[in-house]
């Protein structure tokens, strides 16, 4: 039976309904500061916590609930005679429900505030109370999520109490929340690239129908702090996103964000199948489509500029899973919405520098994201690339970063005409890309050539310029072939493996 509740919330969503329900059940309500004022102004009978503790709020609100008269009432085990004897002797009344949500550190840490201002949003009293209540969940109901209010109200209406299983679940949510909350604070204070303990702070964004395959369950979690493209996008149309959709959308968006020029990326199974730049969105899309008109079917198309009606009409002619762009003209959106299953995604956040993580059995690999394109670029052949060839070489390196290794991209006039990836040796990747391209001007490789065979193959297809990291013990073989065939070659000094 709940006889006494303590309510202290930052987010006041639904709190009046809960408080008035408790009041109707003759539950005594204790509250603090702004919550006390809010409840009192709305006609709820409430006791100021100072009346309970006999001690005023102090240190600019840092100390309000940190008092034995509060925590003794929360932590006392009701069927422990010694506990009950002690609190009775000390004049402590049991507290049967704790309703608390925390200072919004997750949000405030990203605002334009000083370090000291952000520190003030690190909650101390709230976490202490809810941890205490969660530890003693058999005797105390703890609520930290506004979405749980209604369920608890209904359970009390039906059973006159909250059952042990619900209490346990609510207690588990406390420690789940505190893990994320403390992780965010830890990362804020440490500012270490690779701390001793890796603490991640993610919140469930949505349940997914299934994972990579229908027999795999799945959910999508997003970072509790920061602004990221795959956290802050807006779905304007279409079915719910799937596990594969989100993974593919991430790579497609990162690819187009590589370019200052108007760019389009068509992607399938986490691999670009067509990438192009143009003077207009329509031109970029047309060129990307022409890279591989077969593989684009059922894929994802991403743009780094607003989509216009003409482009939308062309997109609507084929089956696509997703179209993602920074924005859409109103008439373009109307066209795309005619395809009710097509997911139309507005994504304004640019791809960010950060960390990449990969799970292995029993561990997580963490690395800095691959954000450096070139380093110490130098021409290593007798012939140098033309200005246009150099533009295409840089374009090719931007694309090849997002192709599974071993990866080769063949480019002509800002268009990835052939993409070969996921091969266990480089010559196979080169043959795949060259064969798909049919014709091309330049070739980009994600890693060095171990032998001269890739340069030989490129020459057969009329390639005029090559860009690669260099660094092989047999670099001279490739340089010799290029000089003999009249091909220019550029070394970048930066490898772009993608596994």
Curated annotation (Swiss-Prot):
Pathway: Purine metabolism; IMP biosynthesis via de novo pathway; 5-formamido-1-(5-phospho-D-ribosyl)imidazole-4-carboxamide from 5-amino-1-(5-phospho-D-ribosyl)imidazole-4-carboxamide (10-formyl THF route): step 1/1; Purine metabolism; IMP biosynthesis via de novo pathway; IMP from 5-formamido-1-(5-phospho-D-ribosyl)imidazole-4-carboxamide: step 1/1
Pfam families reported in the protein's UniProt record: AICARFT_IMPCHas, MGS
Gene designation per UniProt: purH
Classification via PROSITE patterns: MGS
Lineage: Bacteria, Bacillati, Bacillota, Clostridia, Eubacteriales
Protein's UniProt name: Bifunctional purine biosynthesis protein PurH
GO MF entries: IMP cyclohydrolase activity; phosphoribosylaminoimidazolecarboxamide formyltransferase activity
Keyword set, alphabetical order: Hydrolase, Multifunctional enzyme, Purine biosynthesis, Transferase
Catalytic activity: (6R)-10-formyltetrahydrofolate + 5-amino-1-(5-phospho-beta-D-ribosyl)imidazole-4-carboxamide = 5-formamido-1-(5-phospho-D-ribosyl)imidazole-4-carboxamide + (6S)-5,6,7,8-tetrahydrofolate; IMP + H2O = 5-formamido-1-(5-phospho-D-ribosyl)imidazole-4-carboxamide
GO BP term, pick one: 'de novo' IMP biosynthetic process
Domain writeup: The IMP cyclohydrolase activity resides in the N-terminal region.
Family: Belongs to the PurH family.
Entry EC number(s): 2.1.2.3, 3.5.4.10
InterPro entries the record matches: AICAR_Tfase_dup_dom_sf, Cytidine_deaminase-like, MGS-like_dom, MGS-like_dom_sf, PurH-like
HAMAP family, per the entry: PurH
NCBIfam families: PRK00881.1 (NF002049), purH (TIGR00355)
One GO cellular component term: cytosol
MGS-like domain location: 1-144
């Amino acid at each position: 039976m709940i006889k006494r509740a303590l309510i202290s919330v930052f987010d006041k969503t639904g709190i009046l309904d809960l408080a008035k329900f408790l009041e109707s059940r003759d539950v005594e309500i204790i509250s603090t500061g702004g919550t006390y004022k809010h409840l009192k102004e709305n006609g709820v009978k409430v006791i100021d916590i100072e009346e309970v503790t006999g001690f005023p709020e102090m240190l600019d609100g840092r100390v309000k609930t940190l008092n034995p008269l509060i925590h003794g009432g929360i932590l006392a085990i009701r069927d422990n005679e010694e506990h009950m004897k002690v609190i009775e002797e000390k004049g402590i009344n049991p507290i049967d429900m704790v309703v608390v949500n925390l200072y919004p550190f997750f949000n405030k840490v990203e605002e334009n505030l000083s370090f000291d201002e952000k520190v003030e949003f690190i909650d101390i009293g709230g976490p202490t109370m809810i941890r205490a209540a969660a530890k003693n969940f058999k005797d105390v109901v703890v609520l930290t999520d506004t979405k749980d209010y209604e369920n608890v109200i209904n359970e009390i209406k039906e059973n006159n109490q909250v059952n042990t299983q619900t209490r346990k679940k609510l207690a588990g949510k406390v420690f789940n929340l505190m893990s994320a909350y403390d992780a965010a604070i830890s990362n804020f204070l440490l500012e270490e690239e690779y701390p001793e303990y890796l603490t991640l702070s993610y919140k469930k964004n949505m349940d997914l129908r299934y994972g990579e395959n229908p027999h795999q369950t799945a959910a999508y979690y997003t970072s509790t702090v920061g602004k990221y493209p795959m956290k802050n996008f807006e779905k304007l149309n279409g079915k719910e996103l799937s596990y594969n959709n989100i993974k593919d959308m991430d790579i497609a968006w990162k690819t187009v964000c590589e370019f200052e020029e108007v760019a389009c990326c068509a992607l399938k199974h986490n691999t670009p199948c067509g990438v192009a730049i143009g003077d207009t969105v329509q031109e970029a899309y047309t060129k990307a489509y022409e890279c591989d008109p077969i593989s684009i079917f059922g894929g994802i198309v991403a743009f780094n500029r607003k989509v216009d009606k003409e482009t939308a009409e062309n997109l609507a002619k084929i089956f696509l899973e997703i179209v993602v762009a920074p924005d859409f003209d109103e008439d373009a959106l109307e066209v795309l919405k005619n395809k009710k299953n097509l997911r139309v995604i507005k994504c304004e956040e640019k791809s960010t520098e950060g960390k990449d993580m990969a799970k292995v059995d029993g561990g997580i690999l963490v690395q800095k994201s691959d954000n450096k394109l070139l380093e110490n670029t130098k021409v290593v052949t007798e012939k140098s690339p033309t200005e246009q060839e150099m533009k295409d070489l840089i374009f090719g390196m931007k694309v090849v970063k997002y192709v599974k290794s071993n990866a080769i991209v063949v480019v002509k006039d800002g268009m990835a005409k052939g993409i070969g990836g996921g091969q266990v040796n480089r010559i196979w990747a080169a043959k795949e890309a060259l064969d798909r391209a049919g014709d091309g001007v330049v070739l980009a490789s994600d890693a060095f050539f171990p032998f001269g065979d890739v340069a030989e193959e490129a020459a057969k297809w009329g390639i005029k310029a090559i860009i690669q990291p260099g660094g092989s013990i047999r670099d001279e073989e490739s340089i010799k072939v290029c000089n003999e065939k009249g091909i220019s070659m550029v070394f970048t000094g930066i490898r772009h493996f993608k596994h």
